[in-house]
UniProtKB/Swiss-Prot annotation:
Compositionally biased residues, Basic residues: 59-70
Function text: May regulate cell proliferation and plant growth.
InterPro entries, alphabetized: Rho-like_N (IPR011112), Rho_N_sf (IPR036269)
Tissues expressed in: Expressed in tissues with high cell division activities: in root tips, stem node, panicle, flower and immature seed. Weakly expressed in root and leaf.
Gene Ontology MF terms in the entry: DNA binding
Amino acid composition bias (Acidic residues), ranges on this chain: 76-86, 295-311
Entry-linked Gene3D superfamilies: 1.10.720.10
SMART domains (alphabetical): Rho_N
Species of provenance: Oryza sativa subsp. japonica
Protein name: SAP-like protein BP-73
Name of the coding gene: BP-73
Quaternary assembly: Binds to the DNA in the promoter region of WAXY containing the sequence 5'-ACGCACGCTAACGTGA-3'.
Keywords assigned: DNA-binding, Growth regulation
Length: 375
């Protein structure tokens, strides 16, 4: 390896072949020699080639003398080239070679301290570069291992997540299937139970006999009471005359009391006549009492009622027979002023028996006038 002793020095120009140019280009490419000034001037330009070619033509024209000078010239050129090559290859850290026109080296110098320092620096740089390269090579497998471990951990986590998701999906599907199965089983059970109940109901309905038509039993009700059932019957003209005769007899006996009562009575305080009411005669004959005693039931019958009730009797109560000889006296009494002594109820009964309408709303004086006019 050739290093220049000083940055200011330059190699002399060499007029020869192009081999020196290749060496100069190689030296210029070294990183340690770039800051140093190294000038290798190659004068092998096309003009030199032209001069040589012109010389060759001259030698060819000149004859044998020129032929003799040509081998000597070639020998000198070859010697110069060999010396230059040997100098370059022999001295690595030596001083630069200076070539003169005679192509002879002037002197060889011993490598100095600066050159040694440069060589040591170059070695240190190489060692550092090698160490860095080794460190990078060592870091690469570590990083690859770490990445591989991370990738394996990530892949395991992904697998676990996928597995958990799959398990959840499977569990959800199983739950849904179980719910569907339970629903189906419940529905089938309900259908079976309903079908069984329907069959049982139909069988029971078939077994039950049809109910017979409702018939109300005949009632055996009989009313048993001590009071005779007497209903007011419409009084005919014949019956009315008989009743009036009985009333006249009673009126004659109770004349003084009736006159006092008639004076105190007012038409507004008269009670309305009830059609269902029965007037009981004050003086009854012995025959009437006998008939009433016959109609009344015994005490033994009322104390111990039988299982069957007696049907209500619709017979007309017996009326005492009055002689027709009293008709003349009745007519005379009706025509006279005795009507004013009668009560309002008695006057209304007389008006009813004679077929007068609206007697229930009439007052006592009106009834007396009507009856007196009709008489």
């Amino acid at each position: 390896m050739l290093l220049p002793p000083h940055p200011g020095r330059t190699l002399p120009a060499y007029h020869g072949d192009n081999r020196f140019l290749l060496g100069a280009c190689f030296l210029s490419k070294l990183p340690m020699l770039r800051p140093m000034k190294l000038s290798l001037v190659c004068s092998a330009n096309p003009n030199n080639h032209r001069s040589r070619s012109s010389d060759i033509t001259r030698h060819q024209k000149g004859g044998s003398a020129r032929r003799k000078s040509k081998p000597y010239q070639e020998k000198d050129d070859s010697e110069n080239i060999d010396e230059f090559d040997t100098d370059i290859m022999s001295s690595k850290n030596g001083p630069p070679i200076s070539l003169t026109s005679n192509s002879r080296p002037q002197a060889t110098s011993v490598p100095g301290e600066r050159e040694k320092e440069i060589v040591e620096l170059f070695k240190r740089v190489q060692a550092q570069l090698r160490a860095r390269g080794k460190g990078k090579e060592e870091k690469k497998p570590e990083q690859a291992k770490a990445q591989g471990e991370r990738g394996s951990v990530d892949s395991l986590l992904n697998l676990l997540r996928k597995h958990s998701v799959d398990q959840r999906r499977k569990s959800g599907d199983e739950k849904e299937q179980s719910v569907d199965q339970t629903k189906r089983s419940n529905e089938s059970g309900n259908k079976q139970n309903s079908s069984i109940f329907i069959k049982n109901d139909t069988q029971e309905e078939q077994k039950k006999p049809h109910p017979a038509a409702f018939k109300r039993p005949a009632s055996n009700f009989r009313r048993r009471s001590p009071v005779p059932n007497v209903k007011f019957q419409p009084v005919t003209n014949v019956d009315a005359e008989r009743v009036i005769n009985n009333i006249n007899d009673a009126v004659q006996e109770a004349k003084p009391t009736l006159e006092n009562k008639a004076a105190t009575d007012e038409p507004d305080s008269v009670s309305t006549f009830e059609p269902n009411s029965v007037i009981e005669p004050e003086n009854l004959s012995l025959d009437d009492l006998d008939h009433i005693s016959d109609d009344e039931p015994d005490a033994s019958d009322t104390d111990e009622p039988s299982g069957e009730y007696d049907e209500p009797s619709l017979q007309i109560p017996s009326v005492p027979i009055i002689d027709e000889s009293h008709d003349t006296t009745l007519k005379s009494s009706l025509g006279g002023p005795d009507l004013s002594t009668l009560k309002v109820t008695e006057l209304r009964e007389l008006a009813k028996s004679r077929g007068i309408k609206g007697y229930s709303k009439m007052k006592k004086n009106d009834l007396v006038e009507l009856l007196s006019n009709m008489a």
